[in-house]
């Protein structure tokens, strides 16, 4: 009787593990995600060019970080960077996604950026890593750091 009960429980457990997982809801189409992220990168660059630190800040998720900054420090940091870009004539940013991956909850973007002056000359280049998180159905910056 005990063997029969244990065997039945193990079969139910095995069946529920094998067939009870819903993998379709956890998948993210990386091709579609890449289009969305590249669009968000362009939007981010446009906000920077326009000097709109509030719109930049609003692209971040709750609990997000920019390097080691959080909350209002992110807003202050972008405000300072915008002022510097106006003084240095480096308001144009070009983002290029080089890699995009997912764990089904987050998108991890690796890329390069280039600051250009008003004549289109390259002034500064670098690399970045961004972790995107969905919040209220929209992808938001969750971790943002230069490499």
Give short role names for the model-derived ranges.
Residues 41, 48, 52, 60-64, ...:
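Sec/Tat-exported extracytoplasmic proteins
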Residues 44, 56-57, 64, 109, ...:
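Hydrophobic pocket/interface hotspot
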Residues 57-91:
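Short solvent-exposed beta->alpha transition segments
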Residues 60, 70, 101, 111-113, ...:
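A mature extracytoplasmic/lumenal domain signature
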Residues 81-119:
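Surface-exposed, charged secondary-structure patches
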